[in-house]
């Protein structure tokens, strides 16, 4: 269309008388169209204008930068919101004591308060323990061990009480804690060996009270001294005299301790 119009105009100018070139109109030629650059990609030819490509590249770059900036701004805003929420939660959070149910603003304050409660309870337990030990079993020197080990009975040797409980050495009675481990009295039928009855230990009446009182004396040194003196005076009667009624000769008993 442009070429035909140009030809018509030139044809009209030929018919018109023109005195000078200045009267001629100025007509610009249309620029020739550049051939589109051919791009081969994976064996296929792609045709596109360079101008379009150049204009598209900066626009894409601008859009990507705008998207990046918007995403960063959104992330920053989200972080600020999270920080504000954490601050609000910390301000609203209360640490409650398990003992008195009081609220504290920080965990450090709560820890110190609970440690004070624990110390008070330990002191209270110690005070209750000492009061219990003071009121229960005050006359027993071993009441502490009896409370801890549940051991309420004393254990004394039984040989000191067998003679007095069985055969009545004197009219003096022994204390109650000396007579707990006594044996039962012998039966009417004494034990026999090969048909012969065994003899029984008997305490002579002359030495029963003195010897046993010497054993029960408070000081052990005096008890052993009286024991040695009486054994030197009466060697045949100390410590006990064995009565053997109708014992056969062929029966021999070893009664040495």
Curated annotation (Swiss-Prot):
Compartments in which it is found: Nucleus
MF (Gene Ontology): DNA-binding transcription factor activity; transcription cis-regulatory region binding; zinc ion binding
Residue spans, zinc finger C2H2-type: 95-117
Bias-annotated ranges (Polar residues): 50-65
Sorted UniProt keywords: Abscisic acid signaling pathway, Cytokinin signaling pathway, Developmental protein, Differentiation, Gibberellin signaling pathway, Metal-binding, Nucleus, Transcription, Transcription regulation, Zinc, Zinc-finger
Regulation: induction: By gibberellin.
Loss of function: phenotype: Reduced trichome production on cauline leaves, stem branches and sepals.
Chain spans, region Disordered: 48-92, 108-128, 214-238
Skewed-composition ranges (Basic residues): 115-126
Name of a matching Pfam family: zf-C2H2_6
The UniProt record lists the keyword Transcription regulation: yes
Gene Ontology CC entries for this record: nucleus
Highest taxon of the lineage: Eukaryota
Tissues of expression: Expressed in developing cauline leaves.
Any GO BP annotation: gibberellic acid mediated signaling pathway
SUPFAM superfamilies per record: beta-beta-alpha zinc fingers (SSF57667)
Function of the molecule: Probable transcription factor required for the initiation of inflorescence trichomes in response to gibberellin and cytokinin. Is not involved in the regulation of trichome branching. Is functionally equivalent to GIS2. Acts as a negative regulator of abscisic acid (ABA) signaling during germination and early seedling development.
Additional notes on this entry: Seeds over-expressing ZFP8 show decreased sensitivity to inhibition of germination by abscisic acid (ABA).
Descriptive protein name: Zinc finger protein 8
The species this protein was found in: Arabidopsis thaliana
The gene coding this protein: ZFP8
């Amino acid at each position: 269309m442009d070429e035909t119009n140009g030809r018509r105009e030139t044809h009209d100018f030929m018919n018109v008388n023109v005195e000078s070139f200045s009267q001629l109109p100025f007509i610009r030629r249309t620029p020739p169209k550049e051939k589109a650059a051919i791009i081969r990609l994976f064996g296929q030819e792609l045709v596109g204008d360079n101008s379009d490509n150049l204009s598209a590249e900066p626009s894409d770059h601008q859009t990507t930068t705008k998207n990046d900036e918007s995403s960063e701004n959104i992330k920053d805003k989200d972080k600020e919101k999270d920080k504000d929420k954490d601050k609000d939660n910390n301000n609203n959070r209360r640490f409650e004591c398990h003992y008195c149910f009081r609220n504290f603003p920080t965990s450090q304050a709560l820890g110190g308060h609970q440690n004070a409660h624990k110390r008070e309870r330990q002191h209270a337990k110690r005070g209750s323990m000492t009061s219990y030990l003071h009121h229960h079993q005050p006359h027993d020197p071993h009441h502490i061990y009896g409370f801890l080990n549940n051991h309420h009975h004393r254990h004394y040797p039984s040989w000191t009480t067998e003679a007095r409980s069985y055969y009545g050495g004197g009219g003096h009675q022994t204390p109650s804690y000396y007579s707990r481990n006594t044996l039962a009295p012998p039966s009417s039928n004494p034990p026999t060996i090969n048909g012969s009855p065994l003899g029984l230990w008997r305490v002579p009446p002359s030495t029963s009270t003195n010897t046993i009182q010497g054993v029960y004396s408070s000081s052990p040194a005096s008890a052993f001294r009286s024991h040695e003196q009486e054994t030197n005076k009466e060697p045949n009667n100390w410590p006990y005299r064995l009565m053997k009624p109708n014992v056969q000769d062929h029966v021999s008993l070893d009664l040495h301790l």
